[in-house]
Swiss-Prot record:
Keyword Glycoprotein: no
Gene name of this polypeptide: tatA
Lineage, opening ranks: Bacteria, Pseudomonadati, Pseudomonadota, Gammaproteobacteria, Oceanospirillales
TM stretches of this protein: 1-21
Record's protein name: Sec-independent protein translocase protein TatA
Subunit structure: The Tat system comprises two distinct complexes: a TatABC complex, containing multiple copies of TatA, TatB and TatC subunits, and a separate TatA complex, containing only TatA subunits. Substrates initially bind to the TatABC complex, which probably triggers association of the separate TatA complex to form the active translocon.
Record-level GO cellular component terms: TAT protein transport complex
HAMAP family, per the entry: TatA_E
Length: 72
């Protein structure tokens, strides 16, 4: 799991972080990080929408569906 890191090692590291920084700072850090990720995703989505609008071409594909009547 994760390159040899067990769940117990992760829990110990988390407990040490809580002791050092406190839950309030970790909560603020988590919300700030989440806001940054959300802002990044929105910026990427806006860029891809702008690019799609410039190069969007509609394609129509006509095809016939053939049914295979082979039974096993």
């Amino acid at each position: 799991m994760l390159g040899g890191i067990s769940i117990w090692q992760l829990l110990i590291v988390l407990a040490i972080l809580v002791l050092i920084f406190g839950t309030k700072k970790l909560k603020n850090l988590g919300s700030d990080l989440g806001g940054a990720v959300k802002g990044f995703k929105e910026a990427v989505d806006k860029d891809t929408e702008a690019e799609d609008g410039k190069t969007a071409q509609h394609k129509v594909i006509d095809a016939d569906v053939k049914k295979d009547d082979k039974s096993a």
